[in-house]
UniProtKB/Swiss-Prot annotation:
The lineage of its organism: Bacteria, Pseudomonadati, Chlamydiota, Chlamydiia, Chlamydiales. Belongs to the dCTP deaminase family. This is dCTP deaminase. DCTP binds at residues 113-118, 158, 172, 181-182. Its EC number is 3.5.4.13. It holds the Pfam family DCD. GO terms for biological process: dUMP biosynthetic process; dUTP biosynthetic process; nucleobase-containing small molecule interconversion. GO terms for molecular function: dCTP deaminase activity; nucleotide binding. Homotrimer. Pathway: Pyrimidine metabolism; dUMP biosynthesis; dUMP from dCTP (dUTP route): step 1/2.
Length: 190
């Protein structure tokens, strides 16, 4: 497997719709306001994806138990805003602005941006498997004892694209993966 460079990512986004919408280069200034942004868009060997304006923040209002086999949404409060405050030692879900279509011979890894990591915010996104498509559900943990702010429409994580030496026998689409073509924030289900 080899990591793919900016030229390949650009070509796949522009001719195959691999990333929509696609920012061809790093965007770190808001064109309308001149405000500095946490960067997003095409980089040398990856693509920095953005958070949408929709968030789900864990809360324990109903004294719930988090069980991935029997998950209920009463563990969350839903927020739609340009920012989201994650309580101390808590967790939020969000989704990407970008819609991804992964080629059959590609696997991605997604790594949190250092700007957030240096503030104690850890981003977890599982790999995008061959022929998976959808909006990315993003998990964000606030590991600090303080409330933490995250920003919609700004960078949150970098996607790295790895091309396989050989084609896989069965793709995510062919095995009918449960998160195929997910829209919005998709909570766990078995």
């Amino acid at each position: 497997m080899s990591i793919k460079e900016d030229k390949w990512i650009r070509k796949m986004a522009q001719t195959h719709g691999m990333i929509e919408p696609f920012a061809d280069g790093q965007v770190n200034i808001d064109a309308e306001t001149g405000e500095k942004l946490i960067s997003y868009g095409l980089s040398s060997y990856g693509y920095d994806l953005r958070l949408s304006r929709e968030f789900k923040v864990f809360t324990n209002v109903y004294n719930s138990l988090v069980d991935p086999k029997h998950f209920t949404e009463d563990t969350f409060i839903s927020i739609t805003d340009d920012v989201c405050i994650i309580p101390p030692n808590s967790f939020a879900l969000a989704h990407s602005v970008e819609y991804f279509r992964i080629p059959r011979n590609v696997l991605t890894m997604c790594i949190g941006k250092s700007t957030y990591a240096r503030c104690g915010l850890i981003v977890n996104v599982t790999p995008f498997e061959p022929e998976w498509e959808g909006y990315v559900t993003i998990e964000i943990s606030n590991t600090t004892p303080l409330p933490a702010k995250i920003y919609a429409n700004e960078g949150i994580a970098q996607v790295l694209f790895f091309e396989a030496d050989e084609m896989c026998e069965v793709s995510y689409a062919e095995r009918k993966g449960k998160y195929q073509k997910q829209q919005g924030i998709t909570v766990p289900f078995v």
